[in-house]
């Protein structure tokens, strides 16, 4: 990513959910020169795309066979639980509730009233 100085509400991460992570990694390597680095077996196939030694995005296998392969945008928040309540109050839905992500913080998934997914 271009910066690590994110304000609440700013996009701070992006990752790709794919049915074929090997094919996706090959495609983005050919397109952008991104190298895929696995996060290890405990990450369930999730890993990081790197360019010039810097992490630029991530890739992981879809967990739901009905899900459509897509890029997900993540937004900075100081409190995932409060954001979850705010999403519901604003008319969005919670796809999955806040959970801990290793030592990286907390993550939750949402859908806005128009059907767009984000986290």
For each predicted feature, which ranges?
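Core segments of cupin and vicinal oxygen chelate
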Residues: 3-54, 89, 99-105, 113
């Amino acid at each position: 990513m271009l910066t690590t100085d994110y304000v609440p509400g700013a996009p701070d991460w992006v990752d790709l959910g794919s049915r074929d992570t090997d094919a996706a990694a090959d495609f983005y390597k050919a397109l952008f020169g991104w190298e895929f680095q696995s996060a290890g077996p405990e990450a369930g196939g999730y890993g990081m795309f790197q360019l010039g030694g810097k992490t630029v995005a991530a890739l992981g296998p879809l967990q739901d066979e009905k899900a459509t392969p897509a890029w997900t945008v993540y937004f900075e928040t100081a409190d995932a639980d409060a954001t979850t309540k705010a999403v519901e109050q604003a008319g969005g839905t919670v796809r999955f509730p806040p959970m801990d992500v290793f030592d990286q913080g907390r993550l939750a998934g949402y859908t806005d009233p128009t059907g767009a997914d984000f986290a």
